[in-house]
Structures are given as C-alpha cells and as structure tokens.
Regions:
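Beta-strand elements of well-folded, non-transmembrane domains
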Residues: 80-84, 101-109, 164-171
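Short, solvent-exposed beta-strand/turn "edge" segments of beta-rich domains on protein surfaces
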Residues: 86-94, 151-156
Length: 171
C-alpha cells in the first residue's frame, strides 16, 4: 500500500473523503434512482467511502464517460499547484493549491422531493468547504463563484466550484 506524500494529493483526498462522509451528500449520490421519496429518510449508506469512491466520486479525474443510465456523480481534481503570488510578488515558501469540485447529474434523476439533486449536493458541498475547520491551511479556503459547465451533453447538468488554499511548501 502506498502512502500519499505530497500535500496536494493528501488535501484533495481529504476533501473527497469529507464530502463522501457527509450523510446528505452520500445519500443524494447513492440513492440516484429515488426521486419520489424524501431521500434523507432512507437508510444510511454503509461504508460511504468504499461505496462511492471511483463509482460516484472521482478523485483527480473527471467522470470517464457519460452515463448509460440516469446517474449523478462528483469529482475533486487538482487544477493547479504553484508558488503563491500576490500583487505581482511570488513567495518562495508558500504554495497555492487550486482544486475543482464538480457535480454532474442526468436530467432523469435530477428532480427529487428534496429539490434539484445537483443543487442540493452543491449547496452542501459549498457549506462544508466554507465551514469545515479540517480544511484550513494558511488561512481559510477561498471559493470562487460556482459556474455551470456547458461542455456536456444536453441531458446533463453540471456545476463546478474552484477552491484555493495556501500552504507551506513542506507541509
């Protein structure tokens, strides 16, 4: 078994794990075939990380192909890892990691009694990213405005948020 050594990989893995362990998110991802019941009243997802990782939640890659059936998934990607710069000055010992967190949902499983599935998931993702103290580094994470992805087939909806964190190069 390999040990993740670099901070960017450890941090992306931590973000994905925290999101998969959230009960609201994992139920919305796991019970993708349930549209006409209150998804939050359904049984807990057993072993959410083992159940969702590389099936519904993808780390450092986008969804490999469009789904053959109605489905929903999420991805956490390292977008950039570079020396921190501010006001035109680059800092030698501080790095800035940029992550993309996205949700893609087929229209057939989109509407639920709890709201639009991808919107419910994305709202929860943003609340976690803004408030989870385990995700702080040098200061708090900075979130960009959420954007809709238009380069997907018409029958899907997708949203992406970019998150930046500063860290010491040897963290």
């Amino acid at each position: 078994m390999s040990v993740i050594k670099s901070f960017p990989d450890r941090y992306a893995s931590k973000v994905a794990t925290i999101l998969m362990l959230d009960e609201e998110i994992n139920k919305m991802l796991y019970y993708n075939d349930k549209n006409d019941v209150d998804i939050y009243t359904l049984p807990r997802v057993k072993n959410p990380v083992g159940t969702l990782k590389d099936k519904k939640v993808f780390l450092n890659r986008r969804v490999a192909e469009t789904f053959k059936e109605s489905d929903v998934s999420m991805f956490v990607n390292i977008k950039n890892d570079a020396p921190h710069s501010k006001y035109g000055k680059t800092f030698r010992y501080i790095e800035t990691l940029t992550l993309e967190i996205g949700v893609i949902c087929h229209n057939a499983c989109r509407n639920t009694l709890n709201g639009a599935r991808e919107s419910v998931i994305f709202d929860r993702v943003q609340r976690i990213l803004k408030t989870n103290e385990d995700l702080q580094c040098i200061g708090e994470p900075i979130l960009s405005p959420t954007t809709q992805s238009y380069n997907i087939p018409y029958e899907y909806s997708a949203y992406i948020v970019t998150m930046k964190v500063d860290y010491f190069g040897e963290m």
